[in-house]
Amino acid sequence: MPNPFRILGYGVAMLTSIQLMAAMPSTAPVAPTKPYVVKSEHGDRQDPYYWLRDDKRQAPEVLAYLNAENQYYQQYADHYKTLNKTLADEIIGRVKQDDSTVPAIKGDYSYYTRYEQGKEYPIYARKPKAGGAEQVMLDVNSLAQGKDFYQIGNFQVSPNQQLLAYAEDTSGRRNYNLKVRDLRTGKDLPSVITGAAASLAWSADNNQLFYIEKDPQTLLGTKVRRHTLGQDVTKDELLYEEKDSSFYMGVGNSADDQYVVVWLESTVSNEMLVLKSDDKSGKFTSIAPRQRDFKYEVEHIDNRWVIMTDWDAPNYRLMTVKDDQIGDRSRWQPLLAHNPDVFIDSFQLFTDYLVINERSNGLDRVRLMPWSDLSKARYVESDEAAYVAKTDNNPEQNSQWFRYRYTSLTTPSSVYEMHMKTGEKRLLKEQEVLGGFDKNNYQTERVWATAQDGTKIPVSLLYKKGLKKDGTAPLYQYAYGSYGISSAPSFRSTVISLVDRGFVYAIAHIRGGQEMGRAWYENGKLLNKVNTFTDFIDVTDYLVTEKYAAKDKVFAMGGSAGGLLMGAIANMAPEKYSGLVAHVPFVDVVTTMLDESIPLTTNEFDEWGNPKQKAYYDYMLSYSPYDQLKKQAYPAMLVTTGLHDSQVQYFEPAKWVAKLRTIKTDQQPLLFRTNMEAGHGGKSGRFSRMIEIADEYAFILSLLPASPKS
């Protein structure tokens, strides 16, 4: 039986953009201009909207402008609020609200996360492995009460499983408070550590907590401290201080809990420091000293370290070193050779098996090998055109079973476990999707678009079966393409609302990610960054030419560095897109990278370039969306940000929108929404995030041209 709400949504969606423009508020907010010069040794630039930057987020004039933009957005969105509600009901209606994860066994307990009907936040709980009543460790719904934003960034149970250390964010800026809860009483200990990163590690005696202290201005982790329970936090020991501001920092326990591991990482190099978890000295030892263009990751088992490294291996290889030989990489022994056609992404260690997450021809798979003979491999892969297979949480190294997660654009996330010796496989849980979803109604496909330089770009597609490739379907195209982060073709229940309305959903695996190996990333960063943008445009052209999509119904979305992508294509090829959605976009590239007081800037010189060097300054300026705005027609655009975003500061998109309003020559809607309580990831509750997605989809659907059937 047809869903009446879905039909209603489709009818409302067919309002023409002309009708909506006629109903729009007559005037958009106009930000005043104020003289300001951004100085650089390579030239000065006028920035009349620089005043929109307020690091304290309190300036009345700035808040008034952001609120005016929010009001303008809301007035526009009110004209399709029925559609918006329909979409929100659909998206939320697919969620099994009282759901829980597959329990993970560690020590004497099985740990899991669950949600309750109608509740925004998770509940972290456990049960005795031998059987018994549930113990709620953290009810985030209770912790979040009365707060505009609340998020648990991390938690770690002590080795004796009696204490829980957890990191909470109450602003959205990823500046955490660290607390310790006594699981025997359910009460938090009195000491609270503030201004910390989310990463944590325990000492073997359950009495000390290792954590990262952040710089209050840049929000970079700079110091490793050790807190003794019951002691005043002002007396916490400083164990290590990082002087190089291009390095990120984190801390955790090795998988076997034998070591505390500090990782220091920049774009092109890293270093890992280790300390026995029962060592009171606090003196860390380096696995191998840092060196430019040399990276490695480590894990510990059976008195040795297994190392994944790019040393003479762009796609990584595995090596090993004994505990008493660390510090000198000439002592490393080969374990698994480099393969130029297979990228090693990560690995897990078991007593009898080595398990690797790897990527071949752009697709993820899992490889299992017995330590007794690493030439004997068993694979977890699929015959679906585009999919993801990766290891899941496996806390017990001595297990004979390992868990992995499988998903595709048509298959909801599924957790399996496999017996490593026999290959026996069993499904533990498949994400339940409500609302009448049937994966057999959908088709996934992998196609290859040709870039301007002849490179073949993989594209993952999702559409409803029966799609006529006649050039009439609307397209919703997504990509990220930075930091070597690969865009996985995983299941998204939200996008079904567009696919059910005839959309083709495309993930463009453009350069700057790492889908096709390390070279794929190298060819989409620094002085090759423009490849990211032209790849995306070339994918659009391919999908239109091959009649997957109508040229007047192409929509695109990206966030953060993907928001930079949206800003770049808006300048480079505005005529190819009917609408763009840019979430928390990084659009003022040069000004941000010149300012080392802004969080993340110094860490990312090897991603974007250091504008103090003229070659990088000129290149970044050539694509920076804010600097390259010009008098031309632009697509309809929805831009979002969070006032407390620490990754991409709110003033970047605010300035961009303010300038764009004065320079664009079209009458298409330009909407800007600031979440006044959120950070980089948007609102913290699960339903709040779904409602924001419904807002985005309603905006896109409202732009579709009228259909004779509407």
Give residue spans per PLM region.
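Beta-propeller blade signature
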Residues: 126-128, 179-182, 223-231, 274-277, ...
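Non-catalytic accessory segments flanking enzyme active sites
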Residues: 61-156, 167, 247-300, 334, ...
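Mature N-terminal segment immediately following signal peptide/propeptide cleavage
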Residues: 27-80, 88
